[in-house]
Swiss-Prot record:
Function field: Produces ATP from ADP in the presence of a proton gradient across the membrane.
Record-given protein name: ATP synthase epsilon chain
Species classification: Bacteria, Pseudomonadati, Aquificota, Aquificia, Aquificales
CDD domains: F1-ATPase_delta
HAMAP family named in the record: ATP_synth_epsil_bac
Length: 136
């Protein structure tokens, strides 16, 4: 068991002793157990699963951020984290359509705008998939 904190700009989403944390990183899905080697890496949108002995796993949808695995503690710092059942499917569909429409006009966009709409599209697609909506 080890202490885990999941933090967003709005505050602490989860804080407690856990057995395992499973999260998507830029290098793929990783599982963190007690005494994991030190690690600092980027988190990508997807599912965060927190396993606590004798409880059902807690699952969250998370967006971009970082995970900091220290010898005695794990901190997940992400832009957003919320229960999968809390995903606003209609809102995410609208954001996906908006991003796709803007990206079709990419000649008129700056590189920064293109990157922002790509992130918006990726985020919406992943959150919709986590909510059980087929988008691809």
């Amino acid at each position: 068991m080890y202490p885990l904190e999941v933090v967003t700009p709005e505050g602490i989403v989860f804080k407690g002793e856990v057995e395992q944390t499973v999260i998507n990183t830029a290098d793929g899905e990783i599982g963190i157990l007690e005494n994991h080697m030190l690690l600092l890496t980027n988190v990508v949108p997807g599912k965060l699963r927190i396993e606590i002995p004798e409880e059902e796993p807690k699952e969250y949808a998370v967006t971009h951020g970082v995970i900091d695995v220290r010898g005695d503690k794990v901190i997940v710092l992400v832009e957003e984290a919320f229960g999968i059942s809390e995903i606003d499917v209609e809102r995410e569909k609208r954001l996906l359509e908006e991003a796709k429409a803007k990206l079709e006009e990419r000649e008129t966009l700056s590189l920064e705008e293109i990157e922002n709409y790509e992130r918006m599209k990726e985020r919406a697609e992943i959150l919709l998939e986590l909510a059980g909506v087929k988008v691809r």
